UniProtKB/Swiss-Prot annotation:
PANTHER family: LACTATE UTILIZATION PROTEIN C. GO terms for biological process: lactate metabolic process. Belongs to the LutC/YkgG family. The gene is lutC. SUPFAM superfamilies: NagB/RpiA/CoA transferase-like. This is Lactate utilization protein C. Gene3D superfamilies: NagB/RpiA/CoA transferase-like. Signal peptide: none annotated. Is involved in L-lactate degradation and allows cells to grow with lactate as the sole carbon source.
């Protein structure tokens, strides 16, 4: 769990800036400007849910990520098949009640372990052992909180029950994407987070935007995959969730 930080010398720092600007500190009466032009809200404004799915599919091709479409009833088989295609376990998952809600709990806790596929569920009390398990894992599996159709990006919230290592350190990565999580682009994702803050929801201090497998390029534009994360990634789109 991340330690709570403290802010020191904030007042003196801000006072010094105001003094350098030749004015008094403004502590009230400051509001966000109303921008005359906000083209970000017009981009993809007329897209339907199905249009966004098509956009997501098309961009998955560009980022070398396979997208599998299914429904809630077919998710079990789709996930099992994809893990087999990634050559099995070990598997690591966050502590997330959606695995049970989506009918995957038996697969995680009984069937895969009985078949010799270890499954590690993130356990905050185990500390650094979670990172060791993530390093040893062949497949990391998470749910996408928000999905950006324009860039085929999944958004993950890190927490004490879902460390960043789950999607970063395994050799391969699978994101389960509820169709209802798809939005056009970063604009809408930012609005969702801002609304959560206005509603008093505690927003995670670590929010990760993941676009397919790890891709890097050197100065000669030679693509190298897997240097900073998984070598392969797949998205499983659940059409009725």
């Amino acid at each position: 769990m991340m330690m709570k930080g403290t802010v020191t010398h904030q007042e003196s720092f801000l006072n010094r800036i105001a003094e350098s600007l030749g004015r008094e500190r403004r502590k009230s009466g400051v509001s966000l400007p109303e921008w005359k032009y906000q083209p970000q809200y017009q981009t993809h404004a007329g897209c339907t849910e199905d249009d966004l799915v098509t956009m997501l599919k098309d961009h998955c091709v560009n980022i070398h990520t396979e997208l599998i479409e299914t429904d809630a009833a077919g998710l079990y088989d789709a996930l099992r098949t994809q893990v087999n295609r990634f050559e099995g376990g070990p598997v690591i998952i966050p502590k997330d009640s959606r695995f049970e809600t989506y009918g995957l709990q038996t697969l995680m806790t009984e069937e895969w372990p009985d078949e010799g596929i270890p499954v590690w569920e993130w356990d905050a009390e185990q500390g650094a052992k979670n990172i060791e398990k993530a390093e040893q894992a062949n497949v990391g599996i998470t749910f996408s909180e928000i999905t950006l159709a324009e860039s085929a990006t999944v958004v993950l919230y890190a927490s004490e029950h879902a460390g960043r290592s789950v999607s970063l350190l395994p050799t391969t990565y699978i994101a389960i994407i509820p169709k209802s999580s798809i939005v056009p682009r970063m604009t809408q994702a930012s609005d969702i987070l801002k609304q959560q803050i206005r509603d008093g929801v505690t927003v995670p201090s670590c929010i990760n935007y993941i676009t397919g497998p790890s891709n890097s390029a050197d100065i000669e534009m030679d693509l190298v995959v897997g240097v900073h994360g998984p070598v392969k990634a797949a998205y499983i789109l659940v059409n009725d969730r």
